[in-house]
Amino acid sequence: MLEFAVSAPFDPAADISAGIIPAQFPWLSLSILFPIVGSLMVPFIPDQGDGRQVRWFALGIALTTFLITVAAYLNGYDPSFSGLQLSERVSWLPNLGLTWAVGADGLSMPLILLTSFITTLAVLAAWPVTFKPKLFFFLMLAMDGGQIAVFAVQDMLLFFLAWELELLPVYLLLAIWGGKKRQYAATKFILYTAGSSLFILLAALAMGFMGGGTPNFEYAVLAQKGFSTSFQLLCYAGLLIAFGVKLPIVPLHTWLPDAHGEATAPVHMLLAGILLKMGGYALMRFNAEMLPDAHAQFAPLLVVLGVVNIIYAALTSFAQRNLKRKIAYSSISHMGFVLIGIGSFSALGTSGAMLQMISHGLIGASLFFLVGATYDRTHTLQLDEMGGVGQKMRIMFALWTVCSLASLALPGMSGFVSELMVFTGFATDEAYTLTFRIVIDGLAAVGVILTPIYLLSMLREIFFGKENVQLASNTNLVDAEPREVYIIGCLLVPIIGIGLYPRLMTDSYRTAIEALVDRDVAAMETISRPTAPLIRNPSLAPALLQAPKLP
């Protein structure tokens, strides 16, 4: 018979000696449960049918959740400590090894802040929603709690539950409020993501029950189990498929252009700003941290897949005449740098991968919000039908220009710093042979060159292309309103701030990244050989040298 325990008392001294700092206040549990409870209250809010009261309520809940995460960072998080902080643990179903365990470290805290920040702005972006507003904002708030849980939980079964929790809101947001092909896009999304998540469940059960005795799925316990290399390789392959769908990795990416092609602006912001980052985070947390022996052999494959992402998606973006799909493929290209950074054995490269996730979350959210704002005015997404609207929408053109420059990694913007860190970190990573490093950085540079070409040509076609007489006479072509300027302004502040002073962000996860890389380098030095199963070509094999430290 299953047992239910109310609490499992902490031993602070034992926790600290194990690299865990208990929470003095349940900040993370509050940040997860507050938006979920708020979403359950939405149906009971009196409403006239226009959704005004619901909008303000949802904004208040989302903003409060953001302030809770900020308070957690300021009051309970120490960036200089590499272990788990803000830790909370409650025994739930001990016979199944299921524990309510949450906490934060350098891998998760920045993404928790990003999630609550982007969600708050997405709620503000959803202000024009008048069709079933209660259901819409209920799903938005439920998704907020689920996404924070993905980054905060410290139990692999809880991670799986949180991973699944955010799938249903996205499916409904696509299927109900999407475009003409919304049913197809939503069905494809749920089939890809729910189907691939089966690998997470299988890996969690295998890792938790391995070794016999009472199962335990807590990250700290799993990381110390010392799985065999063959077992790690099997789990790594399954998790790579599951997380590769969400990142996404080519060829597991085809759901993303369809989803973005049919989504509304607020859903765009959540997809690009948060959902894709879940895949990158999970690769770091599980594949690189818990399965270091397998990671040492799979890392070159991640690097190659990253280059494929960068070049393939950039070239495909050229061919897109649909504005949403063009930006969607641009997102896939930029996430390729995350794969290269995770596959590197240098603290600088891996830190660049983390910064690239944060940077792309901000930049991707801004671009997709502008796509939605532009569509509300032009009622078309086809670049061939746009053009000649720059004079009528000068502020909108300025916002598009700044955000596009951020996306193409202009110096002074966050994207430049993150991509430079990945390039430099991999180029100086002596864990790989010189030939391999030159080839990878050279191919990745091709993607960097392609990005400004398709982004700047896109701007020209939207605002300064051949004038569409019917579109130019459209009375809906009003310039950006204050709400839209405010949303983009809120996103540009951290984009420019990080670009000018990257340590604003990198200091928050520096020690955690260094600890992760040290663990992977130790595993590489132990088991990597020029004839490793996945890399029989000696030019691709790790050179067994010490990776450089993050300066």
UniProtKB/Swiss-Prot annotation:
Membrane topology: Multi-pass membrane protein
Record flagged with keyword Oxidoreductase: no
GO cellular component: plasma membrane-derived thylakoid membrane
InterPro entries: NADH_Q_OxRdtase_chain4, NADH_Q_OxRdtase_chainM/4, NADH_UbQ_OxRdtase, ND/Mrp_TM
Pfam families named in the record: Proton_antipo_M (PF00361)
EC number annotated for this UniProt entry: 7.1.1.-
Localization per record: Cellular thylakoid membrane
GO biological process terms, semicolon-separated: ATP synthesis coupled electron transport; electron transport coupled proton transport
Main location: membrane
GO MF terms, alphabetically ordered: NADH dehydrogenase (ubiquinone) activity; ubiquinone binding
Keyword Membrane: yes
Function statement: NDH-1 shuttles electrons from NAD(P)H, via FMN and iron-sulfur (Fe-S) centers, to quinones in the respiratory chain. The immediate electron acceptor for the enzyme in this species is believed to be plastoquinone. Couples the redox reaction to proton translocation (for every two electrons transferred, four hydrogen ions are translocated across the cytoplasmic membrane), and thus conserves the redox energy in a proton gradient.
Similarity section: Belongs to the complex I subunit 4 family.
Protein name, UniProt field: NAD(P)H-quinone oxidoreductase chain 4
Gene: ndhD
